[in-house]
Amino acid sequence: MIIEKINNNVCNMDDFSNTKKHLDKILISSELLLKRVQKLYSESGFEIGVSLGSGETLKNGDILYEDENRIVYIEVLPEEVIVITPTSIKEMGIIAHNLGNRHLPAQFDEGCMILANDYLVEDLLKKEGVPYQKENRVLPKPFKHASHKHI
């Protein structure tokens, strides 16, 4: 079976947690969300091919297949990340400048910056005296290195 379009997500289902259907997860890393063409297997061994159009990506909770007995959906695995919660605008600026010079991809949440787990980043944060935490989080989108050029 090949899926070419995602029509629903478990977040849009009012009765998802109470459904009588078998919930069959496909556990993937956040990096696989970006792959438009791939073969995936659910926890029960159900095989699904994915062939999405240009610009389309998978999202956590996407339903790939549903019938009267089963819902097969994507669940993104948590990954260890570095979470920085700046205590001032100055601290935020210093952190952003230092990390930006290294062209590191970052994500932002309420009051915090999220970075891929990297010992070099940890060394920099320790050197600068910036408090951080390591957490396991499900990322809504993968870290993606953006291309750039200096003018």
Swiss-Prot record:
Keywords noted in UniProt: Chaperone, Cytoplasm, Nickel, Nickel insertion
**Function description:** Involved in urease metallocenter assembly. Binds nickel. Probably functions as a nickel donor during metallocenter assembly.
Designated gene of the protein: ureE
Q: Which GO terms describe its biological process?
A: protein folding; protein-containing complex assembly; urea metabolic process
* Primary location: cytoplasm
Superkingdom assignment: Bacteria
What name goes with this protein? Urease accessory protein UreE
One GO MF term:
nickel cation binding
Q: Which InterPro entries match?
A: UreE, UreE_C_dom, UreE_N, UreE_N_sf
Q: Which family does it belong to?
A: Belongs to the UreE family.
Cellular component GO terms, alphabetical:
cytoplasm
Its subcellular locations are: Cytoplasm
